[in-house]
Amino acid sequence: MIPFNSFSQRLAFGQLKNTSAVDEDNLGVICPKHYGTILSLTNQGLVDLSTRFPLIKGQVDLTFVLNQNIYPLTQANLGTSLTDSPDDTFLDDEFVKVLDLFDAIGDRHVVNTSGHILTPSFNTLRFTDAKITEFTEIASPDPARIRIRYQKKHPTITSTGNINLPPNLETALQLFVASLYISHMGGPDHSAKGDSYYAAYLRHIGEDEMKDLSSTSEVEENDKFTNRGFV
C-alpha cells in the first residue's frame, strides 16, 4: 500500500518538480491549490491501470434459474440469481469484466472459447442449455450454481487514502499523472512534454505486461464453494 501523501511527494520531487504543481517555498510538497487536481488525476490513472490489468479481483455466486440462459451481473440481481459475501461485496461501479468461473467441485471454466459460455456484453453471461445441464449435474443434489471471478476497478482514494498497486506500476501511475497534468498546462512545449510522458507510460505498462513484472498474468486455480466464506 502506498499512502497518497507519499505518492504525491514522489511526484513533487520527480516528474512534477519544475511545474506549478509544486510549492515554491516547500520543495517536495504539492501546492495546496493543485492538490485536488493531482488527486483526481491519480484516481483517473488507477482506473486506467486496474482496467488494463487484473490487479483487483472479486467473486460472486450465480444460481441458475429455470428456463433462463442470460444473466446480467448487476447489483439489481443480488438476492435472486446473484449472491455476494460480506467480505466481497459486488458493486456495479467496480465491475470491469468476467475473468473465469468455477463449478461446484472447483473446476475452472473460461468464457468465449467453446461457445457454451459467452459474454454478449461486458457484464452479462449467456449459457447454452447443455452447459447449464452440465453444471446442474455437477452440483446435484444441491441447486445448480457457479462462482464467477471478475476484475474490479481500484477503489477511489481520498487524500488520506492508500494506493494498492504492485511496485513496478507505481512508476506507471506517476508517468500517467504527470502526462495529463503537464498537458493541461497549455502551450506547445507542455503539450509535447505531456505526450512524451504518456508515451513513456504506454512503454512502461507494455513492458510490464510482456515480462509479467507485476505478476498479473492469469493462472488456473481451484475455488470450491466452501472457500472464502460463501454459503
Q: What does each model-found stretch correspond to?
A:
Residues M1-V231:
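Glycine-enriched, solvent-exposed interface loops adjoining structured elements
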